[in-house]
Amino acid sequence: MIFLSQAQIDALLLEDIQGGDLTTRALNIGHQHGYIEFFLRQGGCVSGISVACKMLTTLGLTIDDAVSDGSQANAGQRLIRAQGNAAALHQGWKAVQNVLEWSCGVSDYLAQMLALLRERYPDGNIACTRKAIPGTRLLASQAILAAGGLIHRAGCAETILLFANHRHFLHDNQDWSGAINQLRRHAPEKKIVVEADTPKEAIAALRAQPDVLQLDKFSPQQATEIAQIAPSLAPHCTLALTGGINLTTLKNYLDCGIRLFITSAPYYAAPADIKVSLQPAASI
């Protein structure tokens, strides 16, 4: 489970409600008891539920019912129902709706990608990068895990990943073996992941025996050719495809023999459509 502190929950609320709801205050309806319900209009893999519930309870509302993160919801299915005074209900309305719509959009997009991949490779995986929309990293991580994806890198201190921009600063930027050996000496507990931008670089990298080789923006044909020769050059190396991988392009790579894909596309998916209904207690 990804942990969000109370301060982070408060920040999600404060973006919208720091001054309260003027309309509710002017109508003098804030003291009335009522319910709020969130419905997913189109169906799909949901996330952001636990965060949404924490936001609602922070406002003093009581959760009556909620689905679980990662659930496959039907079109029109209720995701959350909470109760409390109308002032708190209206304060939570849009802030929570925004979290749910963005989170569910991310998780459902990734779930669709995984379903497509696993029709071809049941053991296939998709890892999502740290290139999330600024300020959304923790929500994004929750959504990725809810959909069944992997977190590629939570931060640059978590894993070793040798890019061309690192090699540019080396005395010999084509000395893959030297770079990989140095990384192994100085980070002996970590797997060594490297990225190649061309087939020539990929072959040179494989000869240096990395643990994982990322192929960046390779065509399906180039990826297939590398996948065919990799077992003889580096039998213990895992291949991954990255760069431009999304729901539309993924199908072009399903025959190349690579089972791990790296993407940031889900973060930019269309938000889910969440319907919100607020009603006084007497009408429920």
Swiss-Prot record:
GO terms for molecular function: nicotinate-nucleotide diphosphorylase (carboxylating) activity. The keyword Glycosyltransferase applies. One of its GO terms (biological process) is quinolinate catabolic process. CDD domains: modD_like (cd01573). It is an enzyme of class 2 (transferase). GO terms for cellular component: cytoplasm. Its EC number is 2.4.2.-. Transmembrane segments: none annotated. Belongs to the NadC/ModD family. This is Putative pyrophosphorylase ModD. It comes from Escherichia coli O6:H1 (strain CFT073 / ATCC 700928 / UPEC).
